[in-house]
Amino acid sequence: MSTYLIGDVHGCYDELIALLAQVEFDPSTDTLWLTGDLVARGPGSLEVLRYVKSLGDSVRLVLGNHDLHLLAVFAGISRNKPKDRLKSLLEAPDADELLNWLRRQPLLQVDEEKKLVMAHAGITPQWDLETAQQCARDVEAVLSSDSYPFFLDAMYGDMPNHWSNELSGLARLRFISNAFTRMRYCFPNGQLDMYSKEAPEDAPAPLKPWFAIPGPVSNAYSIAFGHWASLEGRGTPEGIYALDTGCCWGGELTCLRWEDKQYFTQPSNRQKSLDEGEAVAS
């Protein structure tokens, strides 16, 4: 009975299946955690969604910004970009079933026994766990309702970038989705910076990676996240696990077995890209 955490799959179905075979994943006894961005850029987004959905209770995932963008395309709000390679998914006979399943997935996973939290981009240091859980529920409730297109239409934007319990309506939901799915850097007070994407050693002062600013959640829990492929899984404090290692850019798909903290990797089938590129809706 093992727990396997895998970084952003981005439609890299063959690599996902190879990595799961490498660790001898058994869905009848093991649990798979996925950091989000299941889709886009790789050639197998349709196959990834079908497979992950088939795992049922054996998988715990969170939504990423590419997953949200796919839902916006599905709802007719955003256009499908050829580089995302989503055409076969959007035209599949089971697209409605898959995407209505996807929009009912969470933004946050918490395991109190393991003292483990997972979100696609991380947890803003401005939140304690109770606030993070409530904020996740706020967006999840809208996404799973019939009014989800109204949120998806309003989610694109960088403001507000500072948390307050006084935030309400679509502005509140936009901050929450940005914090869970797009965040990289923060100012020392925890305010989000939505523009900088360079490596931490090149980031302009006073910006810091969100995980370099102590917060109530990181002080009490381990945090697993994806989203930030250019970190290449390095440079995080103890207890913070960066799992996106850029498989869709020619890097690797990374798996962490939680029980013994052993890492496994599967090389990408694609040529290494020098440009990580810009994530859609980021």
From Swiss-Prot:
Catalysis performed (reactions): P(1),P(4)-bis(5'-adenosyl) tetraphosphate + H2O = 2 ADP + 2 H(+)
UniProt KW keywords: Hydrolase
- Which superkingdom? Bacteria
Q: Which InterPro entries match?
A: ApaH, Calcineurin-like_PHP_ApaH, Metallo-depent_PP-like
Cystine pairs annotated here are none
Q: Write down the EC number.
A: 3.6.1.41
> Which Pfam families is this protein grouped with?
Metallophos
State the coiled-coil residue ranges.
none
The stretch of residues making up the signal peptide is: none
> What's its job?
Hydrolyzes diadenosine 5',5'''-P1,P4-tetraphosphate to yield ADP.
Please give the family membership noted in the entry. Answer: Belongs to the Ap4A hydrolase family.
Q: What is this protein called in UniProt?
A: Bis(5'-nucleosyl)-tetraphosphatase, symmetrical
- Identify the gene encoding this protein: apaH
